[in-house]
Amino acid sequence: MKPEEQVGQIVQRLEALESYRAPWESMWQDCTDYVNPRRGDFKAKQARGSATRFDKVFDSTAPLANEQLASGLHGHLTNTAERWFSLRVPGVEPTDSMSRWLQSTVDMMFERTFNVASSNFITAVHELYMDLGSYGTGVFFTEDRPGKSIGFRTFHLADCFVMENHEGVIDTVYRKYKHTARQLVQLYGPVLPKKIMDIAAKSPFQEFTCVHAVEPRADLNYDKKD
């Protein structure tokens, strides 16, 4: 498939997903207004840092309850003071040396990934728990950052569109968001079209609408184990 055809296909799928999700947006906007007003907008767009975000909150019960739920999930599932996961080799009884190696790997993962500020895990996972309590779902993203530790982010549900497979499992996520020309250059470098490179040189903060599509390969062979 030619790149232009692939782009056209992605745009068509995004438009279909936007239409499919539209009936839920009014309810999610209500959840934002009354339960999680800091999170952002689905339908009623407001300026960043707007002081009117909390205008509809006439009772703080729901926002406080959601904060308590998120804190409880954080403390029970991913407590920063505990080793909340372990490693093992399926079907293998570990020797003493294997157990020591696995435990040292767990310690390294906690120290260099999950409990270090540069990975953003602690902040991102708390945002995920806030979204789970507010909307019933959330989008947690793990990204490779060359030369740095793995990075974590929780994307705003308003930017994301999902699709289920035949088993009812989400296997496709589309994210529609904005990047400045400067950010695009930082991310993709010289492979960008000359037009965007020129804009970045003159107006680095000009924004572009971007689409991040994660979906199964069309030529995937399900009979292969890998």
Give a label for each model feature.
Residues 1-225:
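Extended, helix-rich architectural segments
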